[in-house]
Amino acid sequence: MELSYRLFICLLLWGSTELCYPQPFWLLQGGASRAETSVQPVLVECREATLLVTVSKDLFGTGKLIRAADLTLGPEACEPLVSMDTEDVVRFEVGLHECGSSMQVTDDALVYSTFLLHDPRPVGNLSIVRTNRAEIPIECRYPRQGNVSSQAILPTWLPFRTTVFSEEKLTFSLRLMEENWNAEKRSPTFHLGDAAHLQAEIHTGSHVPLRLFVDHCVATPTPDQNASPYHTIVDFHGCLVDGLTDASSAFKVPRPGPDTLQFTVDVFHFANDSRNMIYITCHLKAIPAEQEPDELNKACSFSKSSNSWFPVEGPADICQCCSKGDCGTPSHSRRQPHVVSQWSRSASRNRRHVTEEADITVGPLIFLDRSADYEVEQWALPADTSVLLLGIGLAVVASLTLTAVILIFTRRWRTASRPVSASE
């Protein structure tokens, strides 16, 4: 692998100008290293998996030699290799990921960054130092693209274009919809007795066609799907068990497409919980569109009229396990969350997660009691009336004040005019 690297060395000396040393170029050819003949204070060799740093003890070029104990490498302060005091260099040899080095991926290179630190300390009982503290940034750059073989490419009977493939991530989403399913619901508020219209989708792009399923869903008073209390809405790999009670919750048949699944849930709130809101977390997954639905991949609703389960698609017997509560090997349970995503926008109330499967949290769904709404409306009129009365009161006070001022000036004028009449 051809390696390219780069070293930026800047030493800021107290009371002096900044010294910058260019990086020497080291090339590994035939297992031998060749460096520039000019003496550099710091030499760096970026190898395939390691970093070799050689530091001259005359680091500042002043003739004052530094001590090896005052040199460390990286945020983790790795110490140099053991050397003889008579040697005029100090060496470090560490792995690229060692000593707290950081890695950055650019469009054309992998960049490993660290630094060499010279932190002089007093010797013995002395309280003085004779060299400066210096921090020298170090970078190793490795190209991300290149020909790793010097041999010519041998042709095959398959065109090269047939060996190229693309892998695209899947994007899952769970949204709260209006009753007509045509638009996303603008407000998260509900009244008890309403139904929440939920739409799960998977966006495949150029991926092969997939069929989406809601594996399980749970409602909690907080975004944490492991919170208590909780209520299970979908369980056993696609059984909408919330419809077993007095609710009419069900999957919508037929589905708009293989990549979309719609279902309704009769809204509720947890008893003795003053928050009057819930969050719904659903585990979404997808299978190839040509694969037949089975007990592990299904969407089943309960019909109270026939007292039986029925699927959105596929054979009817795949829903029989919903009554037994055992539909094969359990997937991610409520106590073992996979990935939780919450709404990031208050208006749209949805978040997308990119993976092969996803746990999506939608919420909060806020419930308004109808009696509470009536009380709010009743209180709205007195509030407006109080504003009106306040305005009338201020007007009366202003008029009374003006009348009092006029009377005071009138009396003063009459009092001032009486002595004049007496003198006449």
UniProtKB/Swiss-Prot annotation:
It is a single-pass type I membrane protein. Keywords: Cell membrane, Cleavage on pair of basic residues, Disulfide bond, Extracellular matrix, Fertilization, Glycoprotein, Membrane, Pyrrolidone carboxylic acid, Receptor, Secreted, Signal, Transmembrane, Transmembrane helix. The chain crosses the membrane at residues 388-408. Proteolytically cleaved before the transmembrane segment to yield the secreted ectodomain incorporated in the zona pellucida. Residues 351-424 form a propeptide. GO terms for cellular component: collagen-containing extracellular matrix; egg coat; extracellular space; plasma membrane. Residues 409-424 are cytoplasmic. Belongs to the ZP domain family. ZPC subfamily. This is Zona pellucida sperm-binding protein 3. It comes from Macaca radiata (Bonnet macaque). The gene is ZP3.
